[in-house]
């Protein structure tokens, strides 16, 4: 198998993606920001390389990508998964809220892709997989800044896919629906039950559901797929 770099890899979807790639034999590195203990435990369990990085800071991303290239030698697959969420009325969103949301959820993918792409282009092979959200497709009340950032990530995916396809690089976006991660920590059991009822398959999604879709897009069998937005949502919002 090849090499993979996963941003936001210490918890939730990212951590499960690290586990899935490592289990398949990929040499894997992942970025984490604040979750030091979780990152080190995951690295010990999987053999993946844990690298501290603030994806909203271009210099931090530059340094972290250089470290990833040092330990992996090259990067075949980049998974831009790092993300944050926040629920707020639109009129209560501060400048800092807005900048932080776009910095992590959108700029982080731009910075990491910019660092990794030259190597992919020179080798004429690469996979970039962005992790968006259903809210980037349909919008979410009280999450305007989050929805806007994820919609931007979809736009980045579609435009970059066209630009780098002649160089052998594919770019796609996974858009999860309601997934059981700590991002749902503010939801009551009743709220979660309602969301499960509103999902046609009758349950919430799991990080494993998303990780398997990411693995599929990383596989050589998906070589003719680029510029696509793939919903992993159990029919929710469709």
Annotate each predicted stretch with a short phrase.
Residues 165, 170, 225-227:
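Short, small/polar-rich loop/turn modules that mediate ligand/substrate recognition or access, typified
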Residues 89-90, 97-102, 184, 191, ...:
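Substrate-binding pocket helix/loop in short-chain dehydrogenase/reductase
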Residues 118, 162-163, 223:
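Alpha-helical segment proximal to the catalytic Tyr-Lys
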Residues 24-40:
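Conserved glycine-rich Rossmann-like NAD(P)H-binding loop of the short-chain dehydrogenase/reductase
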Residues 10-11:
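Conserved glycine-rich cofactor-binding loop
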Residues 84, 91-110, 125, 129, ...:
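Catalytic Tyr-X3-Lys loop
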Residues 133:
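Residue(s) in the substrate-gating loop at a strand-loop-helix junction
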Residues 113, 149, 157:
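Active-site helix of classical SDR
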């Amino acid at each position: 198998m090849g090499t993979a770099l996963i941003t936001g890899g210490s918890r939730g979807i990212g951590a499960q993606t690290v586990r899935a790639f490592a289990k398949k034999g990929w040499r894997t590195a992942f970025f984490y920001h604040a979750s030091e203990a979780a990152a080190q435990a995951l690295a010990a369990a999987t053999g993946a390389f844990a690298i501290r990085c603030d994806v909203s800071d271009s210099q931090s991303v530059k340094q972290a990508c250089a470290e990833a290239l040092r330990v992996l030698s090259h990067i075949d697959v980049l998974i831009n998964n790092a993300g944050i969420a926040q629920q707020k009325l639109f009129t209560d969103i501060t400048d800092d809220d807005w900048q932080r949301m776009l910095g992590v959820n959108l700029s982080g993918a731009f910075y990491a892709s910019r660092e990794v792409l030259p190597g992919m282009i020179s080798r004429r092979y690469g996979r970039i997989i962005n992790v968006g959200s259903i809210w980037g497709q349909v919008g979410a009340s009280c999450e305007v800044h989050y929805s806007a950032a994820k919609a931007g990530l979809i736009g980045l995916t579609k435009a970059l896919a066209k630009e780098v396809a002649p160089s052998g690089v594919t770019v796609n976006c996974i858009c999860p629906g309601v997934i059981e991660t700590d991002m749902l920590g503010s939801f009551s059991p009743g709220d979660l039950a309602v969301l499960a009822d509103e999902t046609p398959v009758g349950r919430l999604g799991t990080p494993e559901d998303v990780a398997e879709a990411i693995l599929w897009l990383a596989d050589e069998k998906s070589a003719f797929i680029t510029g696509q937005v793939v919903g992993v949502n159990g029919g929710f919002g469709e």
